[in-house]
Amino acid sequence: MKYLKIKLILLFLLIGITSCKQDKRKLFIIGDSISIGYTPFVTENLKNIAEVSHNPGNAQHTGTGLSNIETWIEANDWDIIQFNWGLWDLCYRHPDSKVQGHRDKKNGTITYSLHDYASNLDSIVTILKTKTNAKLIFVTTTYVPENEAGRFQNDVIRYNEAAKKIMKKHSIMVNDIYEQSILIHKKFGKGLDDVHYSKEGYEKLSEHVTEFLKTEIK
């Protein structure tokens, strides 16, 4: 009788664990190196309620997004898809530039104009809404320091505003982390010429991402 009780307890525990695993929401994050930086922290923060994945590699600009979005999302039946494009789109590059990534805002050519960025983003959202039933969340593009070699500081504001209009058109939620990213970058940025963050910076960004996602994971 004693062994039967033990077996029943173990069975209930196993059922409970399996149920918890099945109840976890599938979250897919799409983005560039900024999201690659904070995704491990988001994964840890949400480990009890969500299974978090990131698109393979760097999502780069909206052109890359258009080419790959269907392949990326077909890998799973996602509950939530969080996405961002922006920093690569507004970047100026020149083939002769010696700066990493051939960035050059003085002599280079912008990757995607504001108009083309908005158009590409509109097409991507249309694909997402057509191909998946996932809840969609757009995260705004983060801060660009003044001395960044290939990007103008004010362009981020313009591109974010354009993105918000597209999201409003499609009734997509927006997690606007731009203002927070400024404060975080000033303390934990990699420099006045670098859009990236230290480990502590990515952890701070992840807190704002996690907080928003928790309200949507039900």
Across the structure, where does each feature detected by a protein language model lie?
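Alpha-helical cap/lid subdomain in secreted, periplasmic
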Residues: Q22-D23, T64-K218
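Serine/threonine-rich low-complexity intrinsically disordered regions
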Residues: M1-K7, V42, N48-I49, H94, ...
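Serine-esterase "nucleophile elbow" of acetyl-processing enzymes
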Residues: C20-I81, E203-K204
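Bacterial Sec-dependent N-terminal signal peptides
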Residues: M1-K24
